């Protein structure tokens, strides 16, 4: 939403996922308005290796239809995931396009794309090569750039750049279907 001069929005959360429980976390895409500032801090505690997680987060470049690509003041997001008390994942995004002069649309950032999707899979019994092949099939011909990383045992991070939120939300829904969740 629009903000008064200097205002900012915050989202903070801490979720504990018990033994033999599954958390599907998939909020609507974040769409920053021009001159907005958003800070998010989230901790997910997985009590054991039987605690399962699918996490999804989609960030738009701004309201592109209004010419507000990367016109926000600040987008800051910190995500920490612990499994059985051990920190296994940290994602710390800090985008301040106007402040630091970074070409957010350019090389090493959004690479000409407008949306960034992050998908995390933890303790879901997935095999890396099978997941990599499946993701490739889902995104074939969609015009996305993506990468999959195994960051711990049975723990994967998928990052996807696209030209719009639709391919990312569609992928999110296909992932939920694959995992047996609707």
Map each language-model feature to its residues.
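A structural signal for small-residue-enriched, beta-sheet-centric alpha/beta enzyme cores
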Residues: 59-177, 181-182
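Solvent-exposed alpha-helices and their adjacent loops that cap or buttress functional pockets
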Residues: 7-9, 15-17, 35-36, 46, ...
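General beta-strand recognition
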Residues: 24, 52-54, 157
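Feature marks extracellular polysaccharide-active and adherence modules
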Residues: 18, 26, 45-47, 56, ...
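Small-residue (G/S/T/A) turn/hinge positions that recur once per unit in extracellular repeat modules
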Residues: 21, 48-51
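Basic (Lys/Arg-enriched) interaction patch that binds polyanionic ligands
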Residues: 36, 55-58
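Intrinsically disordered, low-complexity linker/loop segments enriched in Gly/Pro
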Residues: 1-41
């Amino acid at each position: 939403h629009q903000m008064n001069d200097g205002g900012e929005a915050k989202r903070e959360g801490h979720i504990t996922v018990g033994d033999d429980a599954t958390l599907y976390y998939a909020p609507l895409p974040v769409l920053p308005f021009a001159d907005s500032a958003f800070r998010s801090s989230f901790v997910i505690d997985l009590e054991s290796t039987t605690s399962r997680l699918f996490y999804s987060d989609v960030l738009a470049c701004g309201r592109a239809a209004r010419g507000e690509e990367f016109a926000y003041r600040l987008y800051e997001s910190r995500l920490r995931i612990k499994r059985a008390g051990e920190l296994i994942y940290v994602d710390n995004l800090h985008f301040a396009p106007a402040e630091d002069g970074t070409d957010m649309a350019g090389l090493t950032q959004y690479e000409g794309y407008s949306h960034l999707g992050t998908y995390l899979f933890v303790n879901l019994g997935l095999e890396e090569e099978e997941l990599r092949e499946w993701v490739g099939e889902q995104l074939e011909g969609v015009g996305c750039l993506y990468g999959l990383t195994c960051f711990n045992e049975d723990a994967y991070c998928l990052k996807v750049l696209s030209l719009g939120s639709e391919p990312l939300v569609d992928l999110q829904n296909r992932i939920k279907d694959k995992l047996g969740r609707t």
